[in-house]
C-alpha cells in the first residue's frame, strides 16, 4: 500500500511539477507589472471617504495640469473625477461648506503675476507667493502623469474583460501662513473595470478604470488634512 501511495505521489509531482521546499518570493522584476495585473489591489474602494472640511479656511485650487496623454474622453473623465472630489471636500455654503474658495479669475491673475519657473514642478516658495497674493490660507496643486493601462480577458461570443489603469498624480497642499507643505507626494493608485460581455455589449470600460484610479488618488490626498 505504501509503495502504491508513493507511486501516486511521484506521478502527481511529475505531472504538475514538484513544489519547492520553500515558497519562492516574487522578484523585483516581476513586481514591475504587478500594478497592472487584473488586479489584486485594483479597487481600494471605501477604505477611506472624503468628508467636507470642518475648519473654516480659505483655499485656492490652481489649474489642474494634465500630462496624461489620454484621449479627450479619458481627460474629461479624469478632470470630472478630480472636480467631484474637490467639491466633496469643499462644498458650497448652501450645502453646509465652511471654506472660501478663490475664484478662477483671481487665481489666473495671481499666477500671471507670479509665474512658475517650471509649470509642472512648482517649488514651495512659488506656491506660497501665489497664496499670499490671493490672501488665502492654503494652495492646492495637482498634476496627472501618463497612466499605465492594461487589458486582459478574451472575447469570442461571450467573454470576460478587465481594464486596469495605474494612475499617478503629483499632489501638493501648502499652508501659506506657515510656508510649509501639508501634503507633497506622488500618489499612485490602481483603478479597474471588469465585465462579462456578449459580443461588444456591456464590456469593461477603460474610462471607468481611469475614474476609479483618479478618485482613489484624490481620496488619499484630500483625507490627509482637514
Region spans (language model):
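Bacterial N-terminal signal peptides that target proteins for export
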Residues: 1-9
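Bacterial N-terminal signal peptides
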Residues: 9-17
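Sec/Tat signal peptide C-region and signal peptidase I cleavage site
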Residues: 19-23
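C-terminal/domain-edge helix-coil "capping" segments
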Residues: 24-58, 88, 130-134, 146-149, ...
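N-terminal segment of the mature soluble domain
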Residues: 55-145, 176, 180-184, 211-212, ...
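Extracytoplasmic/secreted cell-surface and envelope-processing proteins
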Residues: 69-71, 149-155
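Glycine-rich, phosphate-binding/catalytic loops in enzymes
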Residues: 78-79, 158-160
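Short beta-alpha junctions and helix-cap segments that line functional grooves
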Residues: 127, 153-159
Amino acid at each position: 500500500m505504501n509503495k502504491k501511495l508513493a507511486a501516486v505521489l511521484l506521478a502527481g509531482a511529475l505531472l504538475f511539477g514538484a513544489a519547492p521546499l520553500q515558497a519562492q518570493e516574487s522578484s523585483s522584476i516581476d513586481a514591475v507589472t504587478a500594478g497592472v495585473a487584473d488586479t489584486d489591489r485594483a479597487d481600494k474602494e471605501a477604505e477611506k471617504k472624503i468628508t467636507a472640511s470642518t475648519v473654516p479656511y480659505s483655499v485656492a485650487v490652481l489649474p489642474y495640469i494634465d500630462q496624461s496623454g489620454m484621449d479627450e474622453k479619458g481627460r474629461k473623465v479624469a478632470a470630472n473625477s478630480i472636480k467631484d472630489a474637490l467639491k466633496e471636500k469643499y462644498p458650497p455654503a448652501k450645502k453646509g461648506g465652511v471654506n472660501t474658495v478663490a475664484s478662477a479669475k483671481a487665481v489666473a491673475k495671481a499666477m500671471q503675476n507670479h509665474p512658475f519657473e517650471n509649470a509642472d514642478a512648482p517649488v514651495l516658495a512659488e506656491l506660497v507667493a501665489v497664496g499670499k497674493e490671493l490672501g488665502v490660507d492654503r494652495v492646492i496643486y495637482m498634476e496627472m502623469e501618463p497612466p499605465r493601462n492594461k487589458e486582459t480577458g478574451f472575447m469570442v461570443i461571450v467573454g470576460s474583460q478587465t481594464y486596469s489603469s495605474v494612475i499617478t498624480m503629483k499632489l501638493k497642499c501648502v499652508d501659506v501662513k506657515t510656508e510649509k507643505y501639508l501634503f507633497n507626494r506622488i500618489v499612485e493608485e490602481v483603478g479597474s473595470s471588469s465585465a462579462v460581455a456578449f459580443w461588444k455589449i456591456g464590456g469593461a470600460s477603460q474610462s471607468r478604470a481611469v475614474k476609479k484610479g483618479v478618485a482613489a488618488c484624490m481620496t488619499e490626498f484630500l483625507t490627509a488634512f482637514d
